[in-house]
Amino acid sequence: SGTVWGDLRALVDADDGPPLSLHLARWATLAQLREFLVQRSVYHLREADSHTWGIPRLSGRAKAALVEIQSDEYGNGDDTRMHSALFAQLLRAAGLSDTYGGYWHDATAETLAGVNAISMFGLHRRHRGALVGHLAALEMTSTGPNRNYGKAVRRLGPPAEAAASFAEHVEADAVHEQGAGVGLCGALVE
């Protein structure tokens, strides 16, 4: 397509992998949902922290776009609205620990590899393109899955308000999609 946005959109749209979120929404058991939450806790209890390392590694419009996205991830100054706090609330409602690192020993190699990759991108300036590209891909592909994760929570029985973590992501990530794809990645490429 010739634009950063168009190229990113083509890349994420090309993924035709089976949707885990649809399985969770329609068929998963409570035990499967809880295992999913355990795996997600490795990242989501510190959500945004690794991507925030990109802020001092950027400048101009790219930096401003990342700060805007991260501010929302951190609840815009309200600690109860921080995405990590909402995920912790979900874990407690599902009868799981909200202690950061509490499930590292249960994490799969795939879970740890993903979290380690984000940390590596954030810690090394030379990987800032990978860091912002990862964030853009995440923001551009998460609205639908988060909607389905919320359906799974409501279907399987943790209190409905526990789905607030996923509902927040549906709303926020729809806004972040443009900011990450155009404002962040587009500005970095310029």
Language-model features: where?
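Non-heme di-metal
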Residues: 1-190
